[in-house]
């Protein structure tokens, strides 16, 4: 039943704003986009101004919808649609424009089809009839102070108040009356937000919660949070879980986090991952499940990062550590580790150098790029000297350093004495990890890191004060941390594809038909190359990423190659030649 919009528009609006299912929300947006197209073709669509108003909100960014919907933010289209909505007679668009910085330009002000107060009256009537969006718009008028310039809103605010002259006299002697009136305005906003939420507008719970935060009313804030979580808003699911966690209700907290994780909320993904990875988070009431933890950490690493979640570096590193240490004996996927190490969120972290040194030195999910490996070993060594320890990754860079000395990559000639020194340091680091009970997972048990260092040390013997290979051995070897036989050679992985792609992360080889199929629907493709990295002599070496971008003409595109320059001193600088 519709109270303000036409039935057709109301149905589409409900799909976007009355629930938090991404597929249904996009279906509603597509229906409104189709009405806009018909309008542009000259067909008469009842209530078309309101269609433009709704889409203007959708294109204004995730803070105006719900972030997990994944709607594209387009300020140009948002302003254009809002202006069109106003010109086509949408009263609610006028109230929206009052809340949108720079939307009511002098030109638009002159073209208003009605006064702002008349727009308020129309929307207020819709709110009284039960329209969720009208109630939300009316609440905004009072919550954000727009009632000051709207006579009809002032009348609502002043209902039951003494005359302005009496209020003036009272104001000369006390601030209490002003505070009482401010509380009344907040109560009016809360009343309409409550009606909006109860009528189905899930995002109304966000604003309603804010009003209680500003009043420092923790009891009502928590009540709204649990109501919003029940209504299906992912942000409220996180907040509800956080409340339960603070109370020690860990099983209940996890239920909320998992519900939010199912809707791709980054904070819920992180919290659920923490529960499954680290028994200490729940006082060991939730059993450790490394596979679930990894799944949630890795999804959090690529979850939307606007407003609610910006912890991508942390969750990415947690996934890297878990996969590298292989705690459950089935998580070590070097292709995935190499992929995670390419994530932009961790580029500035010193903690990545031991992992990069190891994967480049031993070709773990990457090309055997020894120059890059040496650079990573050097950076890891400097950070080790600065900070003292990497905790769970010392052995990785020490093994890489030992191997680089063993094959003469650093000193031009093999230096087995230095190699053995670093292998011995690595053995000490591994032994330390395997004997501590206070690991960061909180299991109370030592880790079981494979002793690759001891296996490599078996290749050497001390002769006349220097190390040399034992008879019949030409290089150290290990059975630890093997690459699986099925690991795809010449593999390319789709790192990220914009515009609602469902490809996600994979460690499979992608053929040309797959790329062509994605190219038909996407504007932007970014590939990470795990091995078989190619070079263009005197231009770029070890190309590790290819980015393809096109505008509307799919027969032409820009291709960006990311790799390293020839000069070893510049090998950490990325070049961006366009072909």
Feature-to-residue mapping (PLM):
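Short coil/turn linking the two alpha-helices of tandem helical-hairpin repeats
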Residues: 20-23, 56, 60-72, 98-112, ...
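TPR/TPR-like (Sel1-like) alpha-helical repeat modules
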Residues: 295-301, 378, 416-434
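Contiguous, well-ordered beta-strand patches that form the walls/edges
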Residues: 473-482, 487, 493-571
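Short helix-capping/linker turns of helical repeat alpha-solenoids
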Residues: 23-24, 39-49, 61-63, 67-68, ...
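Structural register within alpha-helical repeat arrays
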Residues: 15, 55, 97, 138, ...
């Amino acid at each position: 039943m519709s109270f303000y919009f036409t039935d057709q528009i109301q149905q589409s609006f409900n799909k976007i704003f009355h629930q938090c299912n991404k597929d249904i929300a996009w279906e509603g947006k597509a229906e409104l986009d189709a009405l806009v197209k018909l309008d542009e073709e000259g067909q008469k669509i009842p209530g078309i101004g309101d269609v433009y108003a709704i889409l203007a909100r959708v294109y204004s960014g995730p803070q105006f919808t719900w972030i997990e919907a994944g709607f594209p933010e387009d300020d140009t289209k948002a302003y254009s649609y809002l202006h069109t909505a106003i010109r086509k007679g949408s009263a609610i668009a006028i109230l929206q424009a009052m809340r949108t910085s720079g939307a009511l330009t002098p030109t638009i002000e002159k073209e208003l089809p009605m006064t702002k107060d008349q727009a308020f009256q129309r929307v207020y009537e819709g709110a009284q009839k039960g329209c969720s969006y009208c109630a939300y718009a009316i609440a905004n008028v009072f919550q954000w102070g727009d009632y000051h310039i709207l006579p009809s809103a002032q009348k609502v605010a002043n209902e039951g108040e003494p005359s302005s002259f009496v209020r003036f006299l009272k104001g000369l002697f006390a601030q209490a009356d002003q505070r009482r009136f401010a509380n009344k305005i907040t109560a009016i906003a809360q009343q309409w937000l409550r009606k909006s939420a109860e009528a189905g507008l899930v995002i109304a719970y966000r604003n309603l919660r804010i009003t209680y935060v500003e009043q420092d009313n923790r009891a009502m804030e928590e009540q709204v949070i649990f109501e919003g979580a029940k209504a299906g808003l992912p942000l409220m699911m996180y907040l509800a879980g956080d409340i339960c966690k603070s109370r020690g209700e860990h099983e209940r907290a996890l239920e909320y986090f998992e519900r939010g994780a199912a809707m791709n909320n980054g904070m819920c993904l992180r919290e659920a991952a923490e529960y499954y990875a680290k028994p200490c988070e729940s006082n060991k009431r939730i059993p450790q499940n490394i596979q679930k933890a990894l799944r949630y950490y890795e999804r959090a690493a690529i979850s939307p990062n606007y407003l609610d979640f910006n912890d991508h570096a942390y969750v990415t590193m947690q996934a890297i550590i878990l996969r590298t240490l292989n705690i459950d004996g089935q998580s070590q996927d070097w292709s995935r580790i190499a992929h995670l190490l390419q994530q932009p969120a961790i580029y500035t972290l010193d903690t990545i150098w031991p992992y990069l040194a190891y994967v480049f030195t031993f070709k773990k999910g990457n090309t055997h790029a020894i120059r890059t490996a040496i650079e990573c070993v050097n950076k890891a060594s400097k950070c080790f000297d600065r900070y003292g320890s990497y905790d769970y990754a010392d052995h990785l860079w020490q093994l890489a350093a030992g191997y680089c000395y063993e094959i003469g990559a650093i000193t031009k000639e093999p230096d087995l004495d230095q190699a053995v020194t670093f292998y011995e340091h690595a053995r000490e680091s591994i032994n330390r990890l395997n004997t501590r009970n206070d690991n960061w997972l909180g299991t109370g048990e030592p880790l079981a890191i494979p002793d690759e260092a001891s296996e490599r040390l078996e290749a050497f013997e001390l002769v006349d004060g220097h190390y040399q290979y034992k008879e019949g051995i030409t290089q150290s070897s290990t059975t630890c941390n093997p690459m699986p036989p099925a690991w795809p050679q010449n593999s390319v992985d789709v790192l990220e594809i914009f515009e609602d792609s469902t490809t996600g992360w994979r460690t499979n080889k992608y053929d040309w038909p797959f790329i062509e199929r994605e190219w038909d629907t996407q504007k932007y493709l970014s590939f990470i190359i795990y091995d078989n990295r190619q070079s263009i002599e005197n231009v770029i070496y070890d190309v590790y990423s290819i980015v393809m971008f096109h505008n509307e003409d799919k027969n032409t595109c820009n291709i960006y190659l990311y790799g390293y320059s020839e000069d070893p001193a510049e090998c950490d600088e990325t070049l961006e030649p366009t072909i």
